[in-house]
Amino acid sequence: MLPRIKIQFLNGQLGTVGESPDGLFALVCGAAAVTKKLELGKAYTLHSFDELDALGVTSENNPRLHKHVQDFYTEAEEGTKLVIFPVDKAKTFTELCDKDTGVIKELITAENGALRGIFVAGDGREATITTNGLDNDLFTALPKAQQLAEWATTSLYAPLFVILEGRGYKDGAVKDLHKEAYNRVGVLIGDTVKASEGAAVGLMAGRLATLPVQRNIARVKNGALKPVAMFIGEKPVEENASAVSDLYDAGYITPRKYVGKAGYFFTDDCLACEQTDDYAHITARRTVDKAYRIAYAALLELMMDELSVNEDGTLQHGIIMAWQQMMENAVNRAMTATGELSADADGTGCKAYVDPTQNVLSTSKIELTLKVRPFGYARYVDVKLGFQVETGK
């Protein structure tokens, strides 16, 4: 080879942030196969409602799958990605969510950890065994879904949450989800169809896909949901306010109405865990999960790197400062700068800390603490109202 000069363009020097698929969700739904077009247990990526035609899915052969996708794209713009995963109608939620034998695990693996949330729906059949106010399968699926999401987090470094369709609601008392410990799983009750055996999970997924990670699906400024009618069981939402309140108190997500506002809104974004859990809401879950992914990507570049140490085996000060700054910069660029974290006066929304006393030379292990600052939310507003009058006259 002749002597030469070769100049390469460097990339990644400006600190810009690439697209993050925070709203990439999967819809797992009981369905019927369509010959040569739709296979069960196979993932399909959609970008519009019309793409269902190519898969042979109609309101006649797959009414619930068709409805959920249609609902999704009434909230999300055409072009928004949605992964659909049709499954055997006979499979229970408990079977689907099993981290060892369930097919949703195969979906998560096949999508290479890209999914941020999974919405699980049945095919609309009547619930056969109902306890605690809902299909019993729902409650046995809750721990399975939690274990599945935890597996994705620890094994694939791909944290996600799961929303289960609250099947079989007939009014009356329900199990209190605030007494559970499933901070990666939520339950939706309520549909656009009267006396539905399922819930409008497509609608919820579509709304959530349009929002940044810190934004609550119940935020009034988001605007009303697109459907002109929504139901809790057999009653319209506006005629079932007591059920909406009771379900909210028990930790379920439902649609609601506000006096003076047209349309429907979600009540909140509760997950099936104690209200004191740091991750009791989808907003907290999505926020910290995004920080998790950013931290993993940043730290991966430092794996097996050489580290300068002091005589006692502890890290040199410069190394500690570099690691802390690297972590904070990565999160602040990707999240604080885009308004997804609550920034302090210096414009930072996170803090990284490396313990300077740890002996890295003997353990080859570095323990780092990363804390991100979330937003507060106006859930309860109390106003003291009275007359303003002048006294002494």
What do these predicted ranges mean?
Residues L208-A322, T369-K393:
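Long, contiguous, structured domain-core segments that constitute the functional module of a protein
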Residues L10-G12, G30-A33, F49, V87-A90, ...:
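Generic structural motif
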Residues L115-D249:
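Conserved, well-structured core segments that form the ligand-binding/active-site neighborhood
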Residues Y296-V354:
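Extended, compositionally biased non-globular segments
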Residues N61, G133-T140, Y279, T283, ...:
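Catalytic cores of large soluble enzymes that bind and process phosphate-bearing ligands
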Residues H47-S48, L82, V87, F93-T94, ...:
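Compositionally biased, low-complexity/repeat regions
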Residues M1-A32, A229-Y264, G347-K351, S364-L370:
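Anaerobic metallocofactor- and corrinoid-dependent redox/one-carbon enzyme cores
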Residues M1-G172:
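Small-residue-rich
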